[in-house]
């Protein structure tokens, strides 16, 4: 009986032990299952989060991931083309400054090397034309018809580096893979920058300007406005248009004086800003920047009037009447542009470009000029105006009048005189 009782107790203990083992094993399986489920959920959430971030970035349109093949192609092409003008870069006068700035002639020589290899190539030299532009022109015209495709534009920078822009159109959106090639201290080409960005909007004008706005960070992501506007001249200007632009309007521009952004003629010259225009005419005549430190007490009467009369059909008496003149010291006042006398405008940064030249029966020449603005408004003709000039046999010329067409003066900021009576 005692033995039976012991047997029963042993059996009961065994069963209880088995039950406890089974429970422990079941708890272990459940625990492992919960861990696996949690890891799967976490992994799914991370994947979902990464996908959402990628989708969000694509929606923003900037800092897009660059395909490895595109990256390799861009880097290889940049370095290969820079090697074409290595000999020019090595012997070029780079000055002593840490930031290399090459002269225009050297940059144009580099452009010719790339041109001869058959690539579309532009420069940052003002009024220079893109060489081998035809393929880009065709690409943009096809894009306007909704046809997908791609085109690459190269640009020689003023430091001798090379920009590469591959524009890709998928039938709906335009993208650009931008790459910048630079020279290192050993004159070896390298890559400093590469990006992939969507164009927010774009247009190709009849005049041949490719105007576009890149997607960029916007408030509240950034505290300041980032300007993504760009303009690239595709179709070339004629040689005469380039020459007249350089000779007659580049030195003036649209800020600091109002020769090109007001209506006037030989019968109505009282509204011109003579005190403002002096420094620009000085730069045109002498080929160097006006140094105000040489004139601490104002500009001497004879020097001021002589320069103005060289470029305008006006008398010394009229200048003294229209300009701000110091009778006591016999000098004309001058003030540097600053926050107290000038509010910067996008229009003021525009580049004047001669688009047509007409010889008149009276021997004068009428230049049709358009203001090209590459900032924010991104417009290849903010205003169109006709500038009348008379050329002398010795190569000198005088401005005779300016007329802004199509009520364009209503669409630009009022002019600010830097010095007021």
Predicted feature locations:
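Hydrophobic helical h-region of N-terminal Sec-dependent signal peptides
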Residues: 10-16
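Bacterial signal peptide processing site
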Residues: 24-26
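C-terminal motif of bacterial Sec signal peptides marking the signal peptidase cleavage site
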Residues: 18-22
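Mature, Sec-exported extracytoplasmic domains of Gram-positive
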Residues: 29-421
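Bacterial N-terminal signal peptides that target proteins for export
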Residues: 1-10
């Amino acid at each position: 009986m005692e033995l039976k009782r012991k047997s029963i107790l042993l059996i009961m203990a065994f069963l209880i032990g088995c039950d406890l083992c089974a429970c422990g094993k079941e708890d272990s399986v459940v625990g492992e299952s919960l861990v696996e489920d949690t890891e799967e959920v976490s992994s799914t959430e991370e994947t979902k989060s990464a996908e959402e971030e990628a989708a969000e970035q694509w929606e923003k349109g900037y800092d897009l991931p660059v395909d490895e093949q595109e990256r390799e192609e861009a880097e290889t092409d940049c370095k290969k083309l820079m090697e074409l003008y290595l000999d020019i870069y090595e012997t070029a006068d780079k000055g002593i400054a840490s930031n290399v700035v090459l002269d225009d002639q050297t940059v144009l020589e580099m452009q010719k090397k790339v041109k001869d290899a058959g690539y579309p190539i532009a420069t940052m030299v003002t009024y220079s034309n893109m060489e081998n532009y035809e393929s880009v022109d065709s690409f943009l015209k096809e894009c306007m018809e909704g046809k997908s495709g791609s085109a690459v534009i190269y640009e020689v920078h003023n430091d001798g580096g090379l920009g590469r822009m591959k524009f890709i159109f998928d039938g709906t959106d335009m993208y650009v893979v931008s790459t910048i090639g630079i020279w290192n201290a050993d004159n070896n080409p390298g890559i400093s920058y590469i990006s992939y960005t969507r164009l927010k909007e774009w247009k190709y004008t009849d005049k041949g300007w490719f105007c576009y706005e890149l997607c960029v960070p916007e408030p509240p992501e950034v505290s300041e406005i980032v300007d993504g506007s760009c303009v690239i001249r595709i179709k070339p200007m004629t040689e005469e248009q380039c020459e007249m632009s350089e000779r007659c309007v580049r030195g003036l521009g649209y800020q600091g004086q109002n020769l090109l952004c007001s209506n006037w003629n030989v019968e109505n010259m009282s509204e011109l800003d003579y005190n403002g225009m002096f420094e620009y005419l000085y730069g045109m005549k002498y080929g160097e920047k006006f140094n105000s430190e040489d004139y601490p007490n104002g500009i001497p009467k004879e020097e001021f009037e002589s320069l103005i009369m060289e470029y305008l059909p006006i008398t010394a008496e009229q200048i003294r009447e229209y300009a701000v003149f110091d009778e006591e010291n016999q000098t004309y006042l001058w003030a540097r542009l600053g926050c107290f006398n000038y509010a910067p405008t996008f229009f003021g940064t525009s580049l004047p470009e001669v688009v047509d030249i007409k010889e008149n029966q009276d021997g004068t020449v009428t230049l049709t000029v358009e203001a090209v603005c590459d900032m924010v408004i991104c417009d290849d003709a903010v205003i169109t105006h006709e500038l009348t000039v008379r050329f002398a046999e010795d190569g000198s010329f005088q401005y005779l009048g300016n007329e802004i067409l199509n009520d364009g003066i209503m669409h630009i900021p009022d002019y600010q005189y830097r010095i007021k009576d």
